[in-house]
């Protein structure tokens, strides 16, 4: 009889004297399975671990083997004696539950088919009427078990102790919900049912099911903890402080809610981690391509120099003399009644193929109050804003100011600004300005000869502005030196190279029926000034 008792007490007494380790390992992961508060009769609750292939059959709870009653009776007395020996004196006064939980490293090495037994620590007169759960294979007996013990004398407060395989004195430590979560910072936390962080579960593909009996004591001060792990995702469950009472959890509903929240969180994280393409800064065309430069800023000394006309022998000051010469040459040209008179613009002196095109040019460019589809540098009109923007991108640079006053180096993107500047700032001086190429003369005779040359000869028209030159060399020097970015727009200051900028004619569509605003995207690297060509190469080309 004694020999049979020794054979029967192999598995569980060894489990009760297992070593308990301090729960301070950073890699340890606590998995709370369930606690049962029993007043009279305790039932053994089997927590099944389903493998990847087949779930555990729950009929094992109802399995009855021959001689099981005698084994339970004998083992009950042995377990009571062992519990009395192992229980410290202070255990009667401490109102806590000792929960033995394996570290994560041991849980990972444990076979997925090993059972987990939850059993109460009973009084000496405690009667165990539930069937004993025996492992399937004898080789699994030494495998670590998770044991939940529960005090029946006092209100319950949770205490967790980590047990190891080797034998050592038992260490118990009361832990709050915050301490349990702070043991392993990698462990997932639940707040308001939303998963925070990634859970490093030991069984990513297994499913843990906890079967609890209905208790008559209601639960108070329930806190959220991790008691279920399904397919690697944690579920919120009740973690009590005073009384223990678990209700059945609708896993299907919780799973659906958890999946929906996970989808929302994944979309939010994608929006945060994904770096979307930033919107390009919007700059108006007038601010990006047009500008003015005041030059030296010092007014020229007034000399009140007079100039004598070679045709009518009139003596006039510089500005009036310039107007007088213009009227003389226009009158002479009109008397010839040539075809050029009907196709040349009297404002910009540009020639057009037909008089109709000349008339359209005058109406769109020189008579319109505020033309929106006109390039102010070229003084040419375009059909739409989009065509104008494309023209500006292909032919001009940001801050391009090709019209220069050669007296004080005043610059502008608009020819009329330079002409007005000369007539106001350089009036009554010794300088004469050519309206075709902005060249400066000091005497009347060379000025009138130069002026007649522009009328009589086929001038070299600059393809990027309205200026005309008598020689090809002068035209190329002008294009190389003046058609560059003279001043960087304020909107581009501080922007790194290769920055994309959106150019628009206006912020709102000008036409009532249109919805979209015409725009074009340019790179700041395209606006960098190019090196001017040497004069020697230009002179060779002119010959």
UniProtKB/Swiss-Prot annotation:
GO BP terms: regulation of DNA-templated transcription
Record location of the Glycyl lysine isopeptide (Lys-Gly) (interchain with G-Cter in SUMO2) cross-link: 173, 247, 261
Superkingdom to which the source organism belongs: Eukaryota
Transcription as UniProt keyword: yes
Positions carrying N-acetylmethionine: 1
Keywords carried by this UniProt record: Acetylation, DNA-binding, Isopeptide bond, Metal-binding, Nucleus, Phosphoprotein, Repeat, Transcription, Transcription regulation, Ubl conjugation, Zinc, Zinc-finger
GO molecular function, one term: DNA-binding transcription factor activity, RNA polymerase II-specific
Protein name: Zinc finger protein 280B
This protein's record includes keyword Acetylation: yes
Entry-linked Gene3D superfamilies: Classic Zinc Finger
A Pfam family the protein falls into: DUF4195
Originating species: Homo sapiens (Human)
Localization terms from the record: Nucleus
Stretches the record annotates as Disordered: 1-23, 105-138, 518-543
Cleavable signal peptide: none
Stretches with biased composition (Acidic residues): 1-10
Compositional bias (Low complexity): 128-138
GO CC terms: nucleus
Zn finger spans (C2H2-type): 343-366, 373-396, 432-454, 460-483
PROSITE patterns xref list: ZINC_FINGER_C2H2_1, ZINC_FINGER_C2H2_2
Biased amino acid composition, Basic residues: 534-543
